[in-house]
UniProtKB/Swiss-Prot annotation:
Keyword Kinase among UniProt keywords: no
Organism: Buchnera aphidicola subsp. Acyrthosiphon pisum (strain APS)
InterPro entries registered for this protein in UniProt: Fe_traffick_prot_YggX, Fe_traffick_prot_YggX_sf
Designated name of the protein: Probable Fe(2+)-trafficking protein
Gene3D superfamilies: Fe(II) trafficking protein YggX
Lineage: Bacteria, Pseudomonadati, Pseudomonadota, Gammaproteobacteria, Enterobacterales
One Pfam family of this chain: Iron_traffic
Role description: Could be a mediator in iron transactions between iron acquisition and iron-requiring processes, such as synthesis and/or repair of Fe-S clusters in biosynthetic enzymes.
Any one Gene Ontology BP term: cellular response to oxidative stress
Keyword Iron annotated: yes
Gene Ontology cellular component list: cytosol
Amino acid sequence: MNRIIFCTFFKKKSEGQDFQSYPGKLGKKIYDQISKKAWEKWIEKQTILINEENLNMFNLEHRKKIEKYMKLFLFKK
C-alpha cells in the first residue's frame, strides 16, 4: 500500500518512501516529509556533488558535507 504524505519539497501530497532511507532523527524527518520522487531527485543531485567535488564517503568530513547539502536541498535550510 502506498503511503501518501505532504511532501515539503514539492509542497503537495505525494507518494511517501517505502522505508526510512537515512538513519536517525533526520532520517525519520525525511521519511515523514519527503516524497519518493523528491528523494530520487536528491540521490541524483548527491551523485553529481560527490563526483564534482571528488568526495569520498569513507571520509567523515565528506559525509558531513553531503549531509549539509542534503538538508539544504530537501528542506531549503
